[in-house]
Curated annotation (Swiss-Prot):
Keywords: Cytoplasm, Methyltransferase, RNA-binding, rRNA processing, S-adenosyl-L-methionine, Transferase
Function: Specifically methylates the guanine in position 2445 (m2G2445) and the guanine in position 2069 (m7G2069) of 23S rRNA.
Enzyme class, first EC level, given as a word: transferase
Protein's name according to its UniProt entry: Ribosomal RNA large subunit methyltransferase K/L
Length: 730
């Protein structure tokens, strides 16, 4: 075999230039960058050194051969031509990895099979010995990459991916791979800061990946020093003496690094379940003297190095996945920015994020940004210098005259990030509405009401108050609106709401309203199960702001519920499409002789049962799980007061066909009116904006539209929110 080899090093997308720089420093020559990889030339000692020292590579591949191919036979022949006896014993084990497609190879499994067959056929001897496949821990791992008709055949010297350092056996919900964490640290300038004796703190450290990688860089510890099994361990071309030399050098450097006074490296994590796993990872890495992890919230983050040294604050905030997370993430970033401005003056900061637009909400100008990929997710690394001249809040200070004490230049109180002009206008509108509607709500003893409903077209939101919580619904923007501008306006609004209303950011819940299909509007969106009790007209009701698109209480129907409460005394009440039966609770409060509530959803009937029980109402209030149309066709009871508030559109596995309120309302009302007792009243309402009541109904029944009477002041701005009718028998 030659003394010089072509090496191919793979890495996460976006790390190519960093890896090229690192590999050059470790001795790789003739370096060229490719997508998610680099290549170059090196001797065996450099190959070993890259394996043990690369903080950024996934794999180190030793290229055996490059050859062109047009079909599967060319693939077989090219692999078979290699003298495999130089690499693998006849009775050894191998694994084959194949990537790419073309030249008649459209299936990677088929390609890997052809490579394996060529190797096995080459090594099969007269005694019948032949290599076998071992996917987990083979003697050699062969890799073939097919790229535009060229096959690149390699041996994987690394074995398992080099990002698997061996210390992180316990991880959190959204782990950052170790080599990506190392790349972020390098881009953030940690090697320079560490060389100067600086500190490092992570306010959301999870299980400590940034902390361990930072300590290994600072202590000059090779990231894969503790790896026991390599891709070259059983390779026949392995040179043990050369490997021992490289490994011993790395061992000596690690011992020297650990003998130095440790730097101040600290992590803080709010989730108590991650504290011990993080500490276990630190101990496995042998860095217990260098790294400490404590439980702590971002809101109380305040690094205090023992010698008052400055350094780097680094963080990978969580990514929002659930309904409503966008609001909580916005406030998390704002909180992080506030803590940096208040407690980390003079430090540098690095935020690795999948939501870079939220970085603008931190109140500090980012002086440099780098693009990365976390798997398939595009991310940005935002770098900050925590200095007053970089602040974009009310905290920016005028230049101090010479001789002024340094402490006077440090902000002593955290102020919110400065609102944009548009956000300030939005905040002013909220405060104006609050002043007007708040008086009415207090007078009527109403806990929950709509404060804002797209009053300003550019801020297409509905903002509802539920006691001291805010429920925000974003209306889907038309396709003609630039999504980036719509997103920026949403973030402006979310920043303004806590300031305008004087509430905690943690009490703002965001949801996105768009055209719903089928039962999607009733699907569970999260699993927090957080119910809270609210009051309406002397009735206690349960709402859930987080788990579903709707909250369990349709605020626009408040006047209708109050009307039902006033009219229900001594009557038999029927509530069709009852949802969480809030109207039923009002009827019971008003003295109804009996109530019957029908809905197809078990979830909402369980909720209805809780609403009734919360008010002390017994089983005489019947709850029926059924398709409303089917139930009406089979029911023969009479009712004095009926309320129907159907969805615009509905389907379910439990019902036959699809309900369409425009198409089916005549049949629905005829069935319901057949159950109405003489002198009784049926109230019919729906929220379909294009709805037209069939004129034939007016010939059969006494019909009166009462839409204007069913709107309270909080919905007066949107008189098309619903339409309502009062029907009686002729």
């Amino acid at each position: 075999m030659s003394d010089r080899f072509e090496l191919y090093l793979t890495c996460p997308k976006g790390l190519e230039s960093l890896l090229a720089e690192e590999a050059k420093g470790l001795g790789l020559d003739e370096v060229r960058e490719h997508t998610s990889a680099i290549r170059g030339a090196a001797d065996m000692e450099t190959a070993y050194r890259l394996c043990v020292w690369s903080r950024l590579a996934n794999r180190v591949l030793l290229v055996l051969k490059r050859f062109s191919m047009k079909n599967a036979d060319d693939l077989y022949d090219g692999v078979h031509a290699v003298d495999w006896a130089d690499h693998l014993a006849a009775d050894g084990t191998l694994a084959v990895e194949f990537s790419g497609h073309g030249s008649g190879i459209d299936n990677t499994h088929f390609g890997a099979l052809k490579v394996k067959d060529a190797i096995v056929d080459k090594l099969r001897n007269r005694e019948g010995l032949r290599p076998s496949v071992e996917k987990i821990d083979p003697d050699v791992r062969v890799h073939l990459r097919l790229d535009r008709g060229e096959a690149i055949l390699s041996l994987d010297l690394s074995g398992h991916s080099l990002h698997q350092r061996g210390y992180r056996l316990q991880q959190g919900a959204a782990p950052l791979k170790e080599n990506l964490a190392a790349a972020v640290l390098i881009r953030a300038g940690w090697p320079r800061i560490a060389a100067e004796g600086g500190a490092l703190a992570d306010p959301m450290c999870g299980v400590g990946t940034f902390l361990v990688e930072a300590a290994m860089i600072a202590a000059d510890i090779a990231p894969n020093l503790k790896r026991e099994r390599w891709g070259f361990s059983a390779w026949l071309g392995h040179v043990p003496a050369l490997w021992r030399k490289v490994h011993d050098e790395a061992q000596a450097r690690a011992q020297a690094g650990l003998a130095k006074p440790p730097l101040w490296i600290r992590g803080y994590e709010a989730d108590p379940r991650l504290i011990q796993p993080g500490r276990n990872n630190v101990e496995r890495a042998g860095l217990g003297d260098w790294v400490k992890i404590y439980q702590g919230e971002v809101s109380t983050f305040e690094p205090r190095p023992d010698q008052n040294q400055k350094g780097l604050v680094i963080s990978n905030p969580p990514y929002g996945e659930r309904l409503g997370d966008e609001a909580s993430l916005l406030y998390l970033y704002q909180n992080l920015g506030e803590r940096l401005r208040q407690a980390c003056m003079g430090w540098e900061a690095a935020v690795f994020t999948g939501a870079p637009q939220l970085g603008k909400r931190m109140g500090i100008r980012s002086h440099k940004q780098y693009a990365f990929w976390n798997g398939a997710l595009p991310c940005k690394l935002l770098l900050f210098k925590v200095q007053p001249d970089q602040f974009v809040t009310g905290e920016r200070r005028e230049a101090q005259p010479e001789g002024t004490e340094a402490r006077q230049q440090v902000p002593q109180a955290s102020e919110p990030a400065r609102l944009s002009e548009g956000a300030q206008m939005f905040a002013n509108r909220l405060q104006k509405n609050l002043k007007q509607l708040g008086k009415w709500a207090r007078r009527e003893q109403i806990d929950c009401y709509r404060l804002y409903d797209a009053d300003m077209p550019e801020y297409a939101l509905a903002v509802d108050l539920y006691q001291d919580w805010v429920h925000v619904q974003e209306y889907a923007a038309p396709r003609s609106v630039d999504p980036d501008k719509a997103q920026a306006r949403l973030l402006d609004a979310l920043a303004a709401i806590p300031q305008a209303l004087g509430i905690s950011p943690q009490r703002v819940v965001l949801k996105r309203r768009e055209r719903q299909s089928g039962t999607r509007q009733y699907e569970r969106q999260a699993t927090e199960g957080r119910f809270q009790e609210v009051n309406e007209g002397g009735v206690k009701l349960l709402v859930n702001l987080t788990d579903y698109l709707d909250t369990g209480l349709f605020l626009d129907h408040r006047p209708m519920r109050m009307r039902i409460q006033r009219e229900a005394a001594g009557k038999r009440f029927l509530n069709l499409f009852c949802y969480t039966a809030t109207a039923t609770v009002h009827a019971a409060k008003g003295g109804a002789r009996s109530t019957t509530s029908v809905d197809l959803s078990k979830t909402y009937l369980d909720w209805a049962r809780r609403n009734l029980a919360l008010n002390g109402y017994s089983e005489r209030n019947r709850l029926e799980q059924s398709d409303v149309m089917t139930w009406l066709e089979g029911n023969r009871d009479s009712y004095d007061l009926i309320f129907i508030d159907p969805p615009t559109f509905s389907n379910s596995k439990r019902m036959e066909g699809v309900f369409d309120v425009q198409r089916d309302h005549v049949q629905l009302l005829d069935l319901a009116m057949a159950r109405l007792a003489p002198g009784g009243v049926l109230y019919f309402s729906n929220n379909f904006r294009k709805f037209q009541l069939d004129e034939h109904l007016m010939a059969r029944y006494v019909v009166e539209e009462i839409s204007a009477q069913t709107l309270d002041p909080d919905f007066a701005r949107n008189n098309r929110i619903h339409r309502a009718w009062r029907l009686q028998l002729r």
